[in-house]
Amino acid sequence: MTFQPEIADIAKISFGVLSPEEILKMSCCKVTSVKVSDKGENIYSKFMGTIENGENCKTCDRDVWECPGHFGHFHLEVPVVNPIFINDACNILRCICFNCYKFIVSVDHLKLENLVRRFQDILLYVKNIKHCYNCESEKLPLSVVNEIIVDEDKNPLDTRKLLRVLENVDDETVRFLGFNPTMSHPKNFIFTVFPILPPCCRPYVMSEENCCDDDLTYQLIEIIKNNQYLGDEFLKKAELKRKKSLLQSSLPPTTDIKQKHLTNLWFRISTYFNNSKKKAKHAATAKPITGLKERIAGKEGQIRHNLLGKRCDQSGRTVVGPDPTLRLNELCVPKEMAEILTIPVHVTPFNRDALTQLVNSNKANFLIKAANPKRSINLKNVINYRGTLLYFGDIIERDGTRITITDTKFVLQPGDTIIRNGKALKEIRYPERKQIELEVGDVIKRQLMDGDYVLLNRQPTLHKASMMAFKVVIKPVKTLKINLAITKPFNCDFDGDEMNIHVPQSYEAIAELKELSCASKCIMSVQNGKPNVAIVQDSLIGLWFLSRDQWFCQTLKRSQFFNLLLTIDKAQNFLTRMDQICHVLKSKFPSKGNWEGSGLDGDGRVSPKVGRMVFNGRGLLSFLFPYDFDYCGGDGLSIESGVFLEGTLEKNVVNTLIKYIYKDYGETVVADFVDNIQFLTNHYLVDRGFTINASDCLKNESIAPEIVSLTRATFSKATTVRDVTINPFIQEQKTLAILNSCTDQCMKLSKECLSSDNNFCVTTESGSKGSIFNICQITSLLGQQTIDGKRVYGLLHPQDNEFQDRGFIANSFVEGLSPREFLHHAMAGRKGVIDTALLTSVSGYGQRQGVKLNEDIKIYPDYTVRDVNGRLYQYIFGEAGYDPSQTIVVDGHQTICNVYRLVNRLNRSYDSSALRPLTEDEIEWMVDFIQPRREYEYIPPDVEQRICSIRRDPIVGQLRRIQTVDALVPILKSHLEKCFYQTLMSPGECVGIIGAQSMGEFSTQATLNTFHVAGSTTTGAVTNCLTRFQEINNATKNPKNITCKVYFTKGNGTIEEIRRRGKDVKHIVFRDVVEKWTVEPATAEWWYATFKQLYAAPIAESGTVTKRVRFHLKRDIVFAYRISPQEIKQSLESKFDVSCIFSPFDEGLILDVFGKIEPHKLEAFVALMLPTYISGLEGIKAISYHKCDELKIWYIQTSGGTLSDFYTLDDIDVEHTTTNNIWDIYHTLGIEAAREFRIKELVEIIGTGVDLSHIKLRADRLTFTGTIQSLTRYTMRGEKPFSKVGFEEIMENFYKTARDAEVDDLTGVSASIMCGKRAKVGTSMFDIKLNLDAILCPPSTSPLLTTEDGTTSATTPIAATTPEQEDDEAFVDYDYT
């Protein structure tokens, strides 16, 4: 029998439980022995495949590389319940009568609506059933103990009986229970035939002494042995041996032997599948055996490590470093690495000669001949014959000189003589070079060359921009090197970081890297629309210095100016640009400079008078910008017609310029802009020089007394606040705020005491490195050290200065820290390191949760956002369908372009008197391309109109404010239409993964960077934000801190009115107002009788009451919450049979309580009185008062409480009252309010770090079912099998999938990767539609264009249609799955 494999995509995979018949059909042999030497088929039968080189499989006649392996089998002497489904089998048996094999209750009595939970509902219903409704037989109680089904007496049940029961269950009952009778019949849950894995899944390891079996083989051997011991032949021999023995009593009976081996068989089969509890161990070493579950599940298992792993050939890894001479899209690759990595190239008639020359010049490593495509020829062994092998110490005589061999790779030359051990070798073979001739159809694997594109990756791969393509530049170095401007998305800092490169192996992959993933085409981030590219460190310092030069002041020599100008690549024509600079300067500064006469000398050189005006930093910077680029922002920067007029270039300003240049001119111009900045500033700093020394750390001596006095004043103020504040929590908060304010004031003093030329100030002001906080720590003081937002705990014994004992450091790094200060600083720094180590795993796991849950969400050709299951999440991505990396914010709205900038640039060529505003008809005509193009199945017409309004309104608002001329109207419309289609998110884009990565990367990087600000309040803020981020994603039902903001409608929202409403909100019980209580004799004092006469109080007579309870109340609590004595009195008297009287004296708030209470029960009675309700809402532990700056009114912030309770209050402001508990919002206001709350909370946590479109998609994904879902494994239960398996609980999901007979059509991302298919996302979502008539037409009519010189050139026909003219047939061939 021969096996001819066919390579084809798998259409679908159906899961189920194999029946004995299917196992036998699948098996290729019956295993009868465990010994290799025995006759018959053993555990390593060649019918199951081979694992030895040179041997072929007896089933498929394939070698070790091509044989897929085949299963074997053996028959079990006793049926064994499959340990995977033992609980399901037990539950099914509880529902079946053992007498009549019917369902124990009538089906008509059950009303089951939920098919997903059908089996669970049935189990709950039959739990209390005692008899079968059909035959009235008693139900047998069953349970599972140690992977064995037992009865109520804990005795194992006969599996033959269990199998007989399940075999007699009819298919209708099986379907009713929720199982598939064909794919997962319950009878298949019991093994009668056991499958044996092929040897390739459990290969042995050969050593010099013996052969070591795999753990699975070891288990199979034990299973087969115990199964053979249960056979009749073995039991008969055991019984015969027992009878022949003289001491029969010393040998166990046959039944005991059978039970022993049966128990061992159950144990071995159970641990064969799952040995996670490490029960099964090797007899010799006691090492736990690895089961199937341990092989498959876990991070290092077969699923995540192999099937979903990213390890591949043609990749390299080494340390990465910076190279300022590289362009933005270039990557320096070590020559040694480039000679190893290869790219396959097919030989054609057009490139045969060139590839032949390449091969014969040692630029290719392997050759695959068309005649034998399975064999790869190593060209290094074929082309270069090295000749005689040289040894270390050999001596080569060449032209009268002697060369001692220290490198055995030394190349001999004809005429060389080899002297070895003092004697000359007689036979010497000199190197030969063989010429290779290529044929059409061959494939060569050439070495990496300059200009090739490779994929660069740094781990952890947190987001899309962690993998980008670069153009290779090969250099004789040992490390990878990249441009510093592209380090931001990789987050690499060159402190030993390593990066990976992946070489594309197909033309399609090369095209995608070049056109889609290239660094120069990924300028803007899809995460938040901000630049991925950023000028950093030295270049920023150079820009800062150059931009501070003033016009009309020559700061550069003529030679220096022109030398620096030569570093700018692709610069404009010098004379034209110089004339333009002079023209702009003359119009802006007519009173400055000498503008008379020509600006050029007789020989065409720049005249000295012009040189004195423009030979400076701003003159150089003017050559960087496009000739028509304008910018005038609130940062003081002014650029007109590309001429840098005024302002200072620092980090944020440069990032803004990069974004505007990208939107106005595209990625090519902005890439050249970034490259030229670095080339210019690098050469400028080489001439100028820049360094930081000890003198930069020294502050002005006059500032030291100010810092000391400021510190003392801060301590005095904090002491005053501590003494007057009663609440310890508020006291600590106020103290910490005062101490932190001291640091803020010292930061200002530090900046003032250093000159503007101080190199520390230069680095901070330019944005190159550090901040004013770092300067303050170096020169002034370190300030208060905090851990988790709290002050450091002090020592046990009292100190002279309480604040310094609690972590306030009054010294700077220059002055040095005292031992106590050093300890506190180390404590805070240690916390930062711990957070980085521990919280990184938490945030990383959160990112993986988001990616796995959203990996199948993508944009379809109708621009709806759906997943492979067809579930609709958004009608259009982000409510407008825009790509965040292509949008820009204008007038507070996200739109396609800045019309103001565009019009200003276009209007420059026209007289301002000819400008006019646009009419409404013109505006409507200019935006008519934004309209519903088709009526799609998923988008209702009213929603489509709303989408159009969202897209149109920001553009229309800008068009109404501009002025232009008639000639520019069609040009303006054409540009708007182009921007619109460029800004749309492309169909096929995996917006689910992009959004999850964007939010995950933000939280992970925030955690990683906490140690940079160790000891400051920023560290605690990041930790709290991460905790809140988890609560929102996981929809925690009991958040850590439930807070509510309560607003009232009546009144003007003053603090006095809010305080009066405090007692209606805070839950106050009698215990809260009691300071202490005592039991005293019931002496009849004079005010008792007066009180009885005035109020007719039911005070017991003195003869019946001998004791009274006197409560001393907390005056501050009673007055703070406006609690009247009458309220306390009514609360106690309404609940207990007591009388309450308040003392009329000013000695304090004293409440006497009388009642008919036995003296020995007084203490227990007081314990019952203390929890008595006084006022407020239940669950509200504390309240505080705050002012809303937006509404300019005060509100109450509570700890605890629910919206439903607040809505019962009078005058409650329902619109603004809110809570941070998403479940409370959902139960009170519904799912839409919960969605908006989720968006609002995520925006507050993340800020502008992630685009709002990604946040909305996350909220829609977790609320689209109408209920709140969490970002956990429980939400994954509704996904396809392979999606669930690729996340968590791998084996458990496999078990459930097989039990429920699920089918996966392999359209998901995880399923496609596991099965070796292309995931239908991105470019793989579509196929290329070819015009075969044009391709196959005869040469006379072939689509070749004849040029003027008579030559021909092939062209690709392009349809000259606009998007409005596309017909519906354009989407016919798209695969929407």
Swiss-Prot record:
Residues 1351-1363 have a biased composition (Low complexity). Its EC number is 2.7.7.6. It is an enzyme of class 2 (transferase). SMART domains: RPOLA_N (SM00663). It catalyses: RNA(n) + a ribonucleoside 5'-triphosphate = RNA(n+1) + diphosphate. Residues 1343-1377 are annotated as: Disordered. Coiled coil: none annotated. GO terms for biological process: DNA-templated transcription. Mg(2+) binds at D493, D495, D497. The keyword Nucleotidyltransferase applies. Zn(2+) 2 binds at C97, C100, C132. Zn(2+) 1 binds at C57, C60, C67, H70. The keyword Nucleotidyltransferase applies. Belongs to the RNA polymerase beta' chain family. PANTHER family: DNA-DIRECTED RNA POLYMERASE, DNA-DIRECTED RNA POLYMERASE III SUBUNIT RPC1. This is Probable DNA-directed RNA polymerase II subunit RPB1 homolog. It comes from Invertebrate iridescent virus 3.
